[in-house]
Amino acid sequence: MNNPDEPRLGCVGDASECAGIISRWIDVTTWMPRRHSTEELIEMMEEGIPFREFWVLGDPIIGYLSFNRELSQIMGLYVDFPGFGAGKLLLDKVKRGKNFIQLWSHLANTSAHRFYSREGFSKMELNQSGQDGIPEVRFEWKIIA
């Protein structure tokens, strides 16, 4: 049995719970338009999980982090209950053994920006039209030798 307080590597079978987390986040985030149904999110996650370092937390799952090793980039970090340490646990897990990580965050997501800044990330650049058409900010974290 896994420790629910320790992130574990996720699998395709976790896609439904993780898509639910994103869907609930979209529902309560006024600036984020819904572009995909929960079913479409599940399909996208099922296709993407095998190609990512994919961490989940909790049983049932309360958060996940998707990491692209080739780009050293966090592709998604979502938790059901922000502010209670789940995001930090996931982020700390993916930081292990790495000296550089980057990510894009929606410009309007200022609470995420505060979180990433507290965790040692620096704002690097602005992209006025991210992949979903919403302005984004790129963050970097690196260990300086």
What are these language model-derived features?
Residues 4-20:
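A short beta-loop-alpha structural element at the N-terminal edge
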Residues 104-106, 122-138:
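Conserved catalytic-core motifs of GNAT/GCN5-like acyltransferases
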